From Swiss-Prot:
One of its GO terms (biological process) is barbed-end actin filament capping. Residues 68-462 form the FH2 domain. GO terms for molecular function: actin binding. Residues 14-70 have a biased composition (Pro residues). It comes from the Eukaryota. Coiled coil: none annotated. Belongs to the formin-like family. Class-II subfamily. Residues 1-74 are annotated as: Disordered. This is Formin-like protein 19.
């Protein structure tokens, strides 16, 4: 109906018809937007809760402290002070008081509010971070191994006192006259490339860059099959003679010390006198009538003092022996091997022997593996076979010394009536001898002083 009217009145009213449809299109649009906006900003509640959330944020002004005055701007970066910052000054606290004090001061451009005037320019001079030096561009190295390892390798190679080919040749010839420095061989072994490095070297044909020396070293290494294992064999051979000598000397010292201690009649007499002296002192107590005493009780003699506190029981023992059995004063001469034996740890000796035995097994493994090396290892294989045969004989000799030494050490502990470790027996006896000799020397000096004093008094008596 309205359309007909509109079409009939087209010539009279052309514009009015379009506005009503536009209003209809615009009128429905305004209502929808508000609900979606409210749903996005607020949770389930309608607009009133939104107003509640926005209202609480501003806290009451009285509790909030006034912010500290800003320090003047600096012209450069300064070294930071890594303190734990406080953001609020509690009323009545030191910081509250300082804040109020700062409010009363005038602020100048070159000063920070403080009890004293601080010059910003002076602080900048002293605590400036300074400009960081720009790193110098380093020339690229050949990507054989990582930069750190390459640098360490080059430094160590420069420290070697022998050319690498000569070192490897000496190892292959098992010739200690050309190279007998164990440390140099160990340093070289520590420079060995990984399997990945070795694989890369065998196929590398590019530019060597600044790693010329390193590249030559690695190329030299890959020429010999299992060169690292062969160098370890040579290192073992260099140390072997010294180790065998040390073990033999140590085991002989243990056997000699055990024999000397158990057969020394003077030591037995000393121990008997100490036992008698102790039983006299402990008469009528639970410690009296002893048939023996723990070995470490020997050291207590120097701690037991007489009434005048000038003489110890050790001094008294030496004094009695000097007057009644002076031949016992040098009992320590019977124990010539004691001091060297006291430096030996039987457990360490056993571990060294075990390490040598395991080392020989590795040598045998390399001997077997080198059979397929071809001519390059022919001389090495022959010399290694001879060395293994000789080394096994020497190790058997050491083992023949070790088992009796261990048995003698156990028998020595039984000799003193307790299950002492061998190291404790030797250390205690050695300490006792030193205390005994010191007490005797002090007694001699005291006797000389008393003799001089008596002579002086006699002279004074004559002059009267």
């Amino acid at each position: 109906m309205s359309l007909v009217d509109i079409s009939g009145a087209y010539s009279l009213v052309p514009l009015p018809p379009p506005p009503p449809p536009l209003m209809r299109r615009r009128a429905p649009l305004p209502p929808p937007p508000p609900p979606p906006l409210m749903r996005r900003r607020a949770p389930p509640p309608p607009p009133p809760p939104l107003m509640r959330r926005r209202a609480p944020p501003p806290p009451p002004p009285p509790p909030l402290p006034r912010p500290c005055s800003r320090p003047p701007k600096t012209k450069c970066s300064l070294k930071p002070l890594h303190w734990v910052k406080k953001t609020r000054a509690l009323p009545g606290s030191l910081w509250d008081e300082l804040q109020r004090r700062q409010e009363c001061r005038d602020i100048e451009d070159e000063q920070i509010l403080c009890a004293i005037e601080l010059s910003v320019s002076e602080i900048e001079t002293i605590f400036s971070l300074g400009a960081k030096p720009k790193p110098k561009p380093e020339p690229e190295k050949v990507p054989l191994i990582d930069l750190r390892r390459a640098t360490n390798t080059e430094i160590r190679l420069m420290l070697l006192n022998i050319r690498l080919p000569d070192m490897i040749a000496a190892a292959m010839a098992m010739d200690e006259s050309r190279l007998d420095d164990f440390d140099q061989i160990e340093n070289l072994i520590n420079l060995f490339p990984t399997k990945e490095d070795m694989k890369f070297l065998l196929t590398y044909t590019g530019d060597k860059g600044n790693c010329e020396q390193l590249f030559q070293y690695l190329q030299e290494v890959v020429k010999v099959p299992r060169v690292e294992s062969k160098l370890r064999v040579f290192s073992f051979k260099i140390q072997f003679g010294t180790q065998i000598t040390k073990l033999t000397k140590g085991l002989n010292a243990v056997n000699s010390a055990c024999e000397e201690i158990r057969t020394s009649q003077k030591l037995k007499d000393i121990m008997e006198n100490i036992l008698c002296l102790g039983n006299i002192l402990n008469q009528g107590t639970g410690r009296g009538r002893a048939v023996g005493f723990r070995l470490d009780s020997l050291l207590i003699l120097s701690e037991t003092r007489a009434d005048n506190s000038k003489m110890t029981l050790m001094h008294y023992l030496c004094k009695v022996l000097a007057s009644k059995a002076s031949d016992l004063l040098d009992f320590h001469k019977d124990l010539e091997s004691l001091e060297s034996a006291s430096k030996i740890q039987l457990k360490s000796l056993a571990e060294e022997i075990q390490a040598i035995t395991k080392g020989l097994e590795k040598l045998k493994q390399e001997l077997t593996a080198s059979e397929t090396d071809g001519p390059v290892s022919q001389v090495f294989r022959k010399l290694l076979k001879e060395f293994i045969s000789n080394a096994e004989t020497q190790v058997a000799t050491v083992m023949a010394l070790y088992y009796p030494a261990r048995g003698n050490a156990e028998a020595l502990a039984h000799y003193f009536g307790y299950h002492y470790p061998f190291e404790q027996v030797t250390a205690t006896l050695l300490s006792f001898i030193r205390l005994f000799k010191k007490a005797h020397e002090e007694n001699v000096k005291q006797a000389e002083l008393e003799k001089k004093k008596a002579a002086k008094e006699a002279e004074m008596e004559k002059t009267k």
